[in-house]
Amino acid sequence: MPANLSSALETFKRQRDAAEAHYLKANRVSVFFREYTAAVETLLAALWVEHFQNSALCLMAVGGFGRGELYPCSDVDLAVVSPAPLSDGIQEQIARFVQTLWDCKLMPSVKSGSVGELCESVRDDITGDTAFLEARFLFGNRQTADELAKKMNAQRNVAAFVEAKLVEMEHRHAKSQGSGAVLEPNIKSCPGGLRDIHTLLWIAKAQGLATDLPDLLKQRILTRAEAGMLSHGYRRLAHIRIHLHLNAKRAEDRLLFDLQPQVAESMGYEGLNLRRQSEELMRVFYRAIKTVKQLGGILTPMLQSRVSSTPLRVTLRIDDDYIQVNNQIAARHTDIFFRRPEHIFKIVEIMQQRNDITALEPQTLRAWWGATRKINRSFYQNSENRHRFAGFFRNGNGLTQTLRFLNLYGVLGRYLPAWEKIVGLLQHDLFHIYPVDDHILTVVRNVRRLALDMHSHELPYASALMQSFEKQDILYLAAFFHDIAKGRGGDHAIQGIADARQFAADHFLTEEESDLLAWLVENHLLMSTVAQKEDIQDPSVLDAFCKRVQTHERLSALYLLTISDIRGTNPKLWNAWRASLLESLFHAAGRYLTGNGGNPHTLFGRRRQEAADLLTRAAVPEKQQKKLWNALGSAYFARHQSREILWHAANLVHDFETPIVRSRILPQSDSFQVMVFMPNGPRLFARLCRIFSRHGFDILAARAFITEHDYILDTFIVQIPSQHAPEDYPDIQSALEAELNSFIHGHTVAEISSHSRRISRRSRYMPIAPSITITPEEDYPDWYSVEITAVNRPFLLADMAEVFFAHNVSLRYAKISTLDERAEDSFTVFSPDLNNPKIQSSLKQTLLEQLS
């Protein structure tokens, strides 16, 4: 590199470093952009003189560089423009120029061509056209740059451009779905992100409007308050993106788990642990994108209406205060929301009641939103407002859209201060993927869908139950309040009771309705906990559950709320296995509350008789049946449900000395049930678990049982890896059975491979502290319940089983609850040694070492 260019490069590096240092000290986005852009332009000036002195070409900054918004590791968008088609020599010259840019580590993105060629290239390319919309002359022939800008603007169909940018935004938002996009959002492309701000400004610029906020204010596109909010939201997002680039040292626009704590710390969130720093950063981020979405709801239709060829304007009278304009509702006088604040809810009530109205007219929305910022205690105390707010839930129609609209514009938080505390609040527990407010509204949506015929195909039984449930509005309210006390420290289910009862008292609920609402909030985790962590075949478990529930109404409401809550936590959590667990508990509890099935001896006897009837119909002699029952022992009927007993009996009755493996695909499920019967021996359970893990199966439940003649009868429910289609299941089943058969006959040893304990990025950087509790079982000496919470990973259950074996603890039952990347496992174990506190402490310590 020539000496003069080396000097220019060194100057650039000093200016770039100075811009970064100045930014980290002063924290001013606009100053950083100005200084860093100037540094790049200084280097480009030297390179241009070296390659194109006295040339007819011109160099233009386009895209982000063109608008002067250059982030530390962003591409430098450029266009080399010629008044005439490029000769081979000029093209080679441009190629050398671009290579020099790469040598200088500028990450260039360069378009080149004549004015005509470049205009033609963007004619059907909305991205290219957008880049040139922000073109800015740098060096060379200014006349060529002016000609390009003039022709680009002349050929642009503004209405088509606006429509294309809005469609592009819709597609971008649609892609930003799923747990990855929520937990590690792309600050540039997510809904409400920087690209949405750019889109608004592009639409304005294409119409010939100035795109700096003061000018948009003068042109009455923005109000003063809106300009301030948009500027604040933009600066927040730009701050985060600058720090993200500086910490990642690359053009990374995703707030990855491993970068969140670094970005938070560099932005000054000090005095907090890494998790709290990350949560605070993400809360700031979510509030910023919420502001952008709020303003987009007003500005997008307003800007679009300036150029779009709208259908014939149809205006209908609604009442003295409102008219309908096409599918929007408009206030006759927009100051009505300030003069008569009760109309803040009234217009929403009208919109909820009428399916032909889908939105507020932009100027009405602007006035309404401005008035909502005046919501205070006196607004809440107005009985008319409280009646209307409760009416949103009683009506039910469009409830999800209504609540999301009120949340987007901050009304829920102003009306209910408890709600404001959970807006944008993230939970780093490895299974929730939404901020608390979004999660709650998703749960409300799920409950509401159960009430609608059009969605009955999703969950037919639950939908039928919901549609016959009399107090649907209380269920909606329970969904709304179930997590409202998150983030306060302590038990949110208990703390939420007071919020629910206060709301009920203020919003004219009856005592009976208030009691049901408060009970559901307090117990919203009860059913999922019992179904996923406890042995619901154990009559004592069912008895304790039903003593908490007490009535069929509570049982139905809790079942519907639990389904909706799990489905609204993380799409990965809901599966056929969880559905069957909840449904089994629901039906068992229903029988118990009706007076059927509560006596343990009656229950065990019925299970045994059902199996005996099956074997008798299969012509199995009674003598042979008794031999089987004696081998299994009476405890067997306490630990297994009827369907398992029938399956085991049919496979074992003719020969209960020969080891066997059997499996079956569970109906309407992506899971296998597997039984393994073989002589007892050391570490068998752990080694079986390793086989399942090696095949990529998630173990959903496991029941370890030892017969009277010292055989193991272990039963597993395992989930098939998600990449397999149902038509692959028989082949997968055959391969699994083949390896298990080889194992039980002593031909293979199932051991772990060295590379299989890898965990996700989320689990590495947002881990949960493992916890272990060991509790003696009442009325059963030497039996214990072991509860474990830890980061989920391959071979976890096998490793824990190894620890139990090493401490002479016999594992008899395992209930596995895998919540995405979090494992909450329950074990029933037998060990006289655990009476010794030292041995119990040693077991805990070894388990913790294995889990950490």
UniProtKB/Swiss-Prot annotation:
One of its GO terms (molecular function) is phosphoric diester hydrolase activity. Keywords: Hydrolase, Magnesium, Multifunctional enzyme, Nucleotidyltransferase, Repeat, Transferase. Uridylyltransferase (UTase) activity is inhibited by glutamine, while glutamine activates uridylyl-removing (UR) activity. It catalyses: [protein-PII]-L-tyrosine + UTP = [protein-PII]-uridylyl-L-tyrosine + diphosphate; [protein-PII]-uridylyl-L-tyrosine + H2O = [protein-PII]-L-tyrosine + UMP + H(+). Residues 1-318 are annotated as: Uridylyltransferase. The keyword Transferase applies. Its EC number is 2.7.7.59, 3.1.4.-. It holds the Pfam family GlnD_UR_UTase. GO terms for biological process: regulation of nitrogen utilization. InterPro entries: ACT-like_dom_sf, ACT_dom, HD/PDEase_dom, HD_domain, NT_sf, PII_UdlTrfase/GS_AdlTrfase, UTase/UR. Residues 673-757, 785-852 form the ACT domain. Has four distinct domains: an N-terminal nucleotidyltransferase (NT) domain responsible for UTase activity, a central HD domain that encodes UR activity, and two C-terminal ACT domains that seem to have a role in glutamine sensing. HAMAP family: PII_uridylyl_transf (MF_00277). This is Bifunctional uridylyltransferase/uridylyl-removing enzyme. It comes from Neisseria meningitidis serogroup C (strain 053442). The gene is glnD.
